[in-house]
Amino acid sequence: MVGTLEFAQATHIAEEWLDDLMARLGWHDRYRTCAALAAALHALRDALPQEAAIDVGNQLPILVRGLYYDAWHPRGRSAARTRAAFLARIQDGVHREPAIDADAVAHAVLALLAARLTAAEIEDAKAEMPHDLHNLWPS
């Protein structure tokens, strides 16, 4: 059972991730940033084979993991296997808000993951993704 202290710590970690992403995007709106994070995490999740998607999810902090797995239906999912499909998945996730550049969000979220997860975890995820999506990750 998660106690109050653990929940407060999990909240703090999730807020750090949001603050980091807001800085990377140059945004000041936490709601929009959270929506963009969730949309990009869903696109990533849907670009990976099921086992690889689970491996990535297991590396995320608990509240970010909740965003990642929200509304996931592994058997009925539509794969984001091309760059266009990946970016469309992000755009759909932010309700096609024209002020949000899906490409910038993809780069920022993948850079956030690269900064906060181990290099080995990132390389494993990249290896499982379609080659068309590799250049969305930081060099």
PLM regions: where:
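Terminal domain-initiation and capping elements
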Residues: 2-9, 28-32, 63-66, 106, ...
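Short, solvent-exposed interaction modules
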Residues: 64-117
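Extended intrinsically disordered, low-complexity coil regions enriched in Ser, Thr, Gly, Ala
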Residues: 47-80, 117-139
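Amphipathic alpha-helical segments within well-ordered protein domains
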Residues: 19-22, 41-45, 91, 110-114
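Short amphipathic alpha-helical segments
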Residues: 15, 19, 34-42, 57
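Intrinsic N-terminal pre-sequences and regulatory tails
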Residues: 1-19, 23, 139
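Short, low-complexity cationic-aromatic patches
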Residues: 27-38, 45-54, 97-108, 114-127
